[in-house]
Amino acid sequence: MSGDAQPSSNQRATEARPPPSPPLVNEKAAIGALCVVCGDRACSHLYYGVAACHGCKCFFWRTVKSRLNYVCRYGGNCSISTAGRNACRYCRFHRCLFVGMKIEAVKMDRKLTKRKKEKTDEDDTDDGGSHESFETTTDAKRAKFDNSLLISSLQLIDKTSSAGNAKLSTLHFVQPSLQNLLDEPELLDGFRSEMSYRATRQADEQLCYDSERRLVTWAIDWCRQTAEIADVHHTNDKISLLRASCAPLVLLELGCQSSFGPSDTQIPFCNNSFLSAHCIPPSTSFLRWKTIQSLNKWAQRELKPLCLRAKEIVLLKALIALNPDANGLSSDAESSIRMLRERVHTALFQLLMENSEPITAASRLAQILLLIPQLSLMGVDVIEQVKVRNTFNKRSAFGEGLLFWQLYGDIFDDANDDSYLEHSASCSPTDSQYTTDSI
């Protein structure tokens, strides 16, 4: 029947009102009841938001998809029922809208169908492109897996370096070289206590020494294990990495703990003690007052607003430990370190991309990388303080602070070789206190 067909006389009405509901039909009919448009038996599930029969569903879909316009010559008051639902398409369509059928549902369905068709056409007409796309996807998945494995390895290094393993150490009886410490990590077992930053008491001279030993041991473990991941096995190369990154690594660890802590004026140590930015530290501390203030300010202004996640911190530590510009690196070690550092960069950016939009991820990556030169500058202050302390305090140089002495020497010795061993042999105190309780 045509769209402008005249309905029968019993379909006409004289009052201007919405199309009446079909007899015995509830507009909120349950699924499987009657069609809310014409009163016919509805299908077993909703169509476009309402219970409708197959005929009304197809009529509504076809009208919306084809953008058809109908005209009613009798005022839009035709009754829509099972017997006469095709008599006036205008009233039938408006009845569909009145009972709640959603036009946007048809448009969404049309878009999905179009996308599926376009995807099928691309697959049929561009087999080469599909193969390349598959290879690209496979490479991306492999790279993502490799990055995840790298992050897991670095997290394990951080966990084992911070864990407690305090056994009797032979360092109480000998003064080994850095080469001995890197070749035989068990020599430092006596100083691998559990690292805890609860900051319950002000650090005195002895607590500063204890924390210093533990932090340097932690840095040694970090550098040694990251070098092994990079396939750098020569001990001299490991020593070069350690000297270049020990101070920045320690400062990053202390800065992160300061930003996490409840106080914004304290630098917590790993033995539950702390130094205050408002108090002058002990004269034998490896951190001078100016460095404490700078570190505290940096932690509160730079680190705290960033809210670094655990994985981001681990990757930042790896970037610091993997310094390809460290003095004394062999060419092979420099190349290996640089390659692993690039992998860490990629893993960090991938991690940021998983949590934010590309622009935000790129901006956050830049903010994180800018932390490294700031740490390096503060690290220079630490090294200068250690050298001055080692020059005028024999207990620091050859007893409690032996590890830092081996790394940086004093103002007369830059500790680039093992000359500090000869110097320590001639200048070590004869008091048995330092030979039995050294470091």
UniProtKB/Swiss-Prot annotation:
Single Gene Ontology MF annotation: zinc ion binding
DNA-binding positions: 32-108
Composition bias type Polar residues, residue spans: 1-13
Disulfide bonding pattern of the chain: none
Domain NR LBD: 173-408
Residue span of region Disordered: 1-22, 112-135
A GO-annotated cellular component: nucleus
Family matches, as InterPro entries: HNF4-like_DBD, NHR-like_dom_sf, Nucl_hrmn_rcpt_lig-bd, Nuclear_hrmn_rcpt, Orphan_Nuclear_Rcpt, Znf_hrmn_rcpt, Znf_NHR/GATA
Keyword Zinc among UniProt keywords: yes
Keywords, sorted A to Z: DNA-binding, Metal-binding, Nucleus, Receptor, Transcription, Transcription regulation, Zinc, Zinc-finger
Chief localisation class: nucleus
Family: Belongs to the nuclear hormone receptor family.
Function, as annotated: Orphan nuclear receptor.
Protein name: Nuclear hormone receptor family member nhr-97
